[in-house]
Amino acid sequence: MQSADSATQAALASGERTATHTTRLGGKDVTAQVESWQVERSYATDLPAAMRAFSGSSAAQLQLQLAGTGGDSAPELYSAWADHATGDLARPGQSVVHETGVGGGSTLAAFRGTLRNRSAASGSDTVQLTALDGAERLRAPAELPRPYTGLYWGRPLASATWCVDELLRQAGLLTSPPPRAPQFVAGQPLTLVHATLHGGFATPYGMPEDLPDPRHYTWSRTGAPHEMALVPRGLPGGETGITASWFPRSRVTVPGSRLLAEAWVNNAVGIGSTVRIDLELNRTGAAIGTISLALDFTQGTVLATSLSSDPQVPGGALQWGFNATAMQTQRGIWHFGAYVDVYASTNNQALPSVIPLLTAPDGSTWVGEPAVFTAASGPQPVAELRKVRLVTSMATEGVQVTSGLTALPTVAEFSQAGTWIKTAELDEAILPLRTIPKISGSQWDAIGQIAKASMSTAEIDERGRFRWRNFTRFATAPTAPDLTLTSVRNIAALTVTEEIDACRNFCVQPAKDWGAVRATAGDIVSDTVVREIPANGSLTMSYVFGEEELDVGPPDTDDDSVVTTGSSFRVATQNAAGTKAVKGAVDALVRREDGTIVLRLTNRTATKLYTVDQSGGPSIRIVPIRPDRDPVERQGVSYVPGSDSERFYGRQEFYGEQSEWVQDLGAAQQLAQAMRVAWEYPVPVLEDVQVLYDPRIQLGDVVRILDTTGATLDTLAWVVGISTSASAGGGVQQTLSLRGVRANGVPADAGLTPDAPALSPAPDTSATYAAVAAAYPTLAALLTANPTWGDVKDGAPA
């Protein structure tokens, strides 16, 4: 329930039900012009009414009747052809905020959304307006990344919950800080990796590469810095933390880059006290460079390293201990990052400068002194950023790497405070995914499909905040109500309904099991021409990709020293065979767009470069990845033979829809079990419950219904539908739809002897053998009578 001030609570306690309201259109107060209003919200689903609290999406609707003002009629002011100076207030898409209350208390949020349509009857003084809630913000085309990584490792890479979070983020409904620079703008910063870790390693910016064993971690909202975190619960042998990594969406060059790597952690949750972010660099040949920032909260140290797999390149390490006491004593949420400057080139190599940033649980932020590596200790020869790696032993959320920064971010810029508002809330992660299903329709359509497949509810509340609830929310029946409604005081009418369609004691959930499916290379897409990349400029190409093919990362830069089996390209200073390959000069960015793979190559040098291979031909090659087989169809079944439910109601089957979102038998079994537990007995529905208006009631609230005058019941029920309407005079009517939290126990049928479902067989009146023998003692008698078979069978002589 919504919280109310003392004046509202006093008015409700005294029985005051004269409604007050405040209505704004486009930010302008039009309260005095509202003649009537109605707000409706409920869970929408194709399940029987008694089941709908467990699955579906809610989209609220507001209807307003608006009068004119200042001597001008409403149609004159607000019709579709009205002057924009007044008509835009009621145009489709305009913002609407509606608040309601009772007595003299403060108004409470009742609706927040946008106008859907307007209708003005000429000659009248009213305009009818219809608005829908924040679900209208989710009408853009739904898009989700489809990385191959889960099939490559045979491990989950995301979950249905992560997909919901990503669809919300696309619409601006955020659960954690957004990517710093999501859009590509030439010369501006660019987000290379943004992994929320909200139930998955997938990301729309970058691509997961290394996935940890699911036995070693869990997803948890408890103690998460913002919404949900990756929490280690076991370590692989010899490791200090669990490891996950991502390819950046653009392979930026070193030298030539300034990077900000960051993450949020909770050092009070997990199994250790260390966390590290690595920037792995792909150098000439098989050599690998690594720039790292590591935190140890037990030691109170921050350590930066610049290392190389090539023994000819010396490594180095630099340490800060300026905030050791705080690191050792403060337990809670930390935000840490490293500003890495590898822009300048000195003798064809970068000398990294690293500045750490840490924000403690108490809000204090420390910015370390720059640590600069030297040619003798920690240089990084020319390379491209190949991988971002996280190694953590504590709860971690929001790994992000941004390139193109021109300077160290300020403390305010680092925190991203004031740049976003948390407007969504998730539930625990469910339905692990090895591959993300193809989706279509709007973001709201996709969220509704996921809600249906996972027995979850999706709703946008009165304040415009999104709430996602799993079926686990209803696993334990509540024992205490949020509000008590009685027939003596609050209830004017109610109807109690019970139907056998709400009983399901044999539940089946199909699954498409991806356990044996792996990733395999598809047909290589090779460029047909050698292309020129302008000096300090960019080149963009697109290649057709099939729907069944999964996302790929940016291609590697071929330097002629190793064989590259995946996607790659080679550049040289001349369009000719035998020209030496150039390394560390081109940023490569890849994205999927409308059935194509778009590749952008950016030249970081003042010399023209050409995409030419050693033989003089085109060098760009993209290797698609696809599943090597179809998933196996399986079924999760939940059934208790001979149960009381089956004895009294018969076997009632519910067969869940085949869904791409259920990808293993364990998840299917869990869903089937939840269905049977929830629906084993038909739960009553209380419909048309007319109550004294209470603006605090919300969907999902638990109310106690105490009826001593009619149905004689005392039960708890979930609110699954609310309809509230009011006229200009302040009269208000509120009608609830409720679903009982449990059935009324097991039937007893005391004193009853239920009739059999069918009558016993009718007596057999056919003639016996003795009767036939008596009627026809001899064969001659039978032949003489010449009876039909019916005559003989019925015992009637001819």
Predicted region positions:
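Short, conserved helix/loop micro-motifs enriched in His/Cys and acidic residues
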Residues: 183, 416-437
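Assembly/oligomerization scaffold segments
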Residues: 1-406, 434-440, 444-455, 488-493, ...
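Surface-exposed, non-catalytic interaction/assembly patches
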Residues: 34, 38-40, 138-155, 434-448, ...
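Short, well-structured active-site flanking segments
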Residues: 460-464
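Surface-exposed fibrous attachment elements
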Residues: 6-17, 179-212, 253, 442, ...
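Stable alpha-helical structural segments in soluble proteins, enriched in small hydrophobic residues
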Residues: 666-680
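Acidic, low-complexity/disordered segments
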Residues: 1-10, 122, 126-151, 298, ...
